[in-house]
Curated annotation (Swiss-Prot):
UniProt keywords, alphabetically: Developmental protein, DNA-binding, Nucleus, Transcription
Gene3D superfamilies, A to Z: High mobility group box domain
PANTHER family the record matches: SOX TRANSCRIPTION FACTOR, TRANSCRIPTION FACTOR SOX-14-RELATED
Single Gene Ontology BP annotation: negative regulation of transcription by RNA polymerase II
Protein name (record): Transcription factor sem-2
Described purpose of this protein according to its UniProt entry: Probable transcription factor required for embryogenesis, vulval development and cell fate specification of the postembryonic mesoderm (also known as the M lineage). Specifically, required for the specification of sex myoblast cells and their development into the muscles that are necessary for egg-laying. In addition, may be involved in RME GABAergic motor neuron progenitor cell fate specification.
Subcellular location: Nucleus
Cellular component, GO annotation: nucleus
Domain of life: Eukaryota
Disruption-associated phenotype: Embryonic lethal whereby embryos arrest at the three-fold stage of embryogenesis. Embryos initially develop normally until the late comma stage where a delay in the elongation process culminates in severe morphological defects. RNAi-mediated knockdown results in 98% egg-laying defective mutants with muscles lacking the egg-laying muscle specific protein egl-15. In addition, mutants also exhibit a multiple vulvae phenotype with animals having two or three vulvae. Double knockdown with let-381, sys-1, hlh-1 or fozi-1 results in no sex myoblast production.
GO function terms (MF aspect): DNA binding; DNA-binding transcription activator activity, RNA polymerase II-specific; RNA polymerase II cis-regulatory region sequence-specific DNA binding
DNA-binding region: 93-161
Renumbered residue ranges of the record's region Disordered: 158-218, 321-359
Length: 404
């Protein structure tokens, strides 16, 4: 073979003569090949060992790709984004990839190439089970790659701190609930430094309010007792306004049992006249006298007090009303109707007593007719006794006492 001429395969390939290498190109190529044969053998042996170590998974080439990228751009501003080929987002910073994520990234792509119809959840299950089945020696290269990516992530995001995002809760209708603000209660509990003592006192727990409520309840109970005791010492003038009501006939023993006798009308008519005479006792000489203050202080109505309750030392004498009332015809009608059991009761109910202004006994002398005298005899019967006793109230009642 003539070395001065170029080989025929170069001319056959259409290469121009001026682009052909010089004549001694073959010797130079042989010399370079002989000098670099040792280094080439060492490099090839290392690459073969690495390929044999990562032969069980297809991600070994990807890990090598990360290393080549790091060697190509050692002083990059975004080393993590360049190593992972991901876009940098200003809204959310992703966490650095761990060993499982480094391994599963290429493994997932491999599964998707062979089974494109497999669901993503099923792929994740298979990846998890296969990762757990690997030994620590098989996981070691991926753990080292994850540590290198973590350092790159720290250089790119020095102020990063992992904060897990909570999934928003869903309402029963399927809508998302608005997340609550956790800082609002803390601001209410802790007032600012420049706040006044009054503002801080308002934001304390409600223990003071509970104690005030208990004190207020105790105060109410004491107040009721004081009011009750104060009512016992009220003056007589405050208790004087008394409005008697007509009691039912069944409250007294002499009330009729049946309404056939017609005594109900007579009874209430007599009560009306008694109140009318008591209010005008100063203008009428024969009107009945009022009761003393003793019965009123005890809280007894005029109808409930007896005729003899005022007899005693220091009290005004009580007198029976002996003047003929304006219901004489009604009384006579009730007496003649056959209800003899109610005659004495109706006559005794006509009698009332009250002290006059001068405290002097005033007797009515209205017995001008025979009918009035008969009524007087019925109202004031004769009392018979066997002992000679001086009764100071005999003149006051106007009763004739016979001593046998």
């Amino acid at each position: 073979m003539d070395l001065q001429k170029p080989p025929n395969f170069m001319l056959d390939c259409g290469m121009a003569p001026h682009m052909m290498p010089p004549i001694n190109w073959a010797a130079a190529a042989i010399a370079v090949a002989s000098s670099t044969s040792g280094a080439t053998n060492a490099t090839s042996s290392n690459s073969v060992a690495t390929s044999q170590q990562l032969q069980h998974h297809p991600y070994g080439t990807a890990a090598g790709g990360y290393k080549h990228a790091q060697q190509a751009i050692p002083k990059s501003v975004t080393p993590y984004s360049d190593a992972t080929n991901c876009k940098k987002s200003s809204n959310h910073i992703k966490r650095p990839m761990n060993a499982f994520m480094v391994w599963s990234q290429m493994e997932r792509r491999k599964i998707c190439e062979h089974q494109p119809d497999m669901h993503n959840a099923e792929i994740s299950k298979q990846l998890g089970s296969r990762w757990r089945s690997l030994t620590d020696e098989e996981k070691a290269p991926f753990v080292a790659e994850a540590e290198r990516l973590r350092v790159c992530h720290m250089q790119e995001y020095p102020d990063y701190k992992y904060k897990p995002r909570k999934k928003p809760k869903k309402n029963p209708d399927g809508t998302l609930q608005q997340p609550a603000q956790p800082q609002a209660p803390q601001q209410q509990q802790a007032p600012p430094r420049g706040a006044s003592p009054q503002a801080r006192q308002r934001k304390r727990p409600n223990t003071d309010q509970q104690s005030e409520t208990q004190q207020f309840q105790n105060f109410k109970s004491v107040k009721v007792e004081q009011d009750w005791m104060g009512n016992a010492h009220m003056s007589h003038a405050q208790k004087m306004p008394f409005h008697p009501s007509y009691p039912s006939p069944s409250e007294f023993g002499h009330a009729p049992l049946t309404p056939e006798s017609g005594f109900y009308d007579d009874y209430f008519t007599q009560q009306h006249h008694q109140q009318h005479f008591a209010s005008q006792h100063h203008n009428s000489a024969g009107s009945p006298l009022r009761m003393t203050n003793l019965g009123m202080d005890m809280g007894m109505p005029p109808q409930m007090m007896g005729h003899n309750s005022g007899f005693g030392a220091g009290n005004h004498p009580f007198y029976l009303h002996t003047s003929p009332p304006s219901v004489d015809q009604d009384d006579m009608r009730s007496l003649s109707s056959g209800s003899s059991g109610y005659a004495d009761c109706s006559a005794s109910e006509q009698s009332t007593s009250s002290p006059n202004s001068a405290g002097v006994v005033t007797m009515a002398t209205a017995a001008t007719t025979t009918t009035h005298l008969d009524d007087l005899e019925q109202i004031c019967p004769t009392v018979t006794t066997g002992e000679l006793v001086n009764y100071p109230w005999s003149d006051a009642l106007g009763i004739d006492i016979n001593f046998s």
